[in-house]
Amino acid sequence: LLRNLCEPVVKVIPAWISPNMITMVNACVIVLMFALCAISPRLAPLDRLLALFGAAVAMFSSMILDSVDGMHARRTNQTSKLGEFLDHWLDTVHVPLVSSSIDLMLEVPAVILGLTLLSSVTIYHAQLALYHRGGKFVHPPTSGMEAQVIATVLLLTSGVVFYLWPRYTPGVGWFVIGAALSSFYFQARQVKFFYERLEWKLGGHLPFVLQGVALYALHLLGALGRLGFVVAVVALSFRGSGTYVLRTLAK
């Protein structure tokens, strides 16, 4: 993917364009993708199909932009601590937005929404905790690029499925549950991967997890609606994981 997609894109980007500008464009693309997924259940079948196809294009574009900004920075000798900070800092928002986009698009039950959303932000926070401790950014078994390719395919598939059949039919229901639980299974494996490398020393990580669990409980009890829960987890990730980014890069 890097060779066939990203490198040709990098070659045509003018040198005067800042890598941070590309990073900010990517943030806008992620927000657009989230909005399309969030509104899709309220749309007519054809409109829903178009919205999810648009979300798939946005997801795939974001995957390319996420690689292109760093490649462009190295190519034009514009690498900086600010660029590294901005990239990781915005990922604290991107990660929960991508995860919740899939959940909202699939209209998963509250229990599954909480499990998949919290596991996604837990992975990134644990990854940053390991980065802060060891000074090296360790990539999980399933990379972000691979996850985004899978998400793109799922968005396209879901668009077709929801166009052909109503969401709340037995077969479609099993498709949704299967997709959501498969996502949680792979995310749980990622959590285990980082916990093992942290040697299960989770002192700085545990408060973040407990705050997420508290928000999950409020959602299950009805005190937080679906969108409110997503916003709360995004804010938690932005503050908790963002603090790790700042502390690590400021060392």
Show the residue positions of the predicted features.
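Membrane-embedded alpha-helical segments in integral membrane proteins
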Residues: 31-40, 96-100, 156-160, 213-219
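C-terminal membrane-associated helical module and adjoining short loops/tails
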Residues: 1-16, 120-251
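Membrane-interface helix starts
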Residues: 15-25
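Membrane-embedded alpha-helical segments that form the functional core of polytopic membrane enzymes
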Residues: 23-82, 98-102, 110-121, 172-180
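Juxtamembrane helix-capping/reentrant segments at transmembrane boundaries
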Residues: 11, 69, 73, 77-90, ...
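Short hydrophobic alpha-helical membrane-embedded segments
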Residues: 24-27, 89-96, 202-212
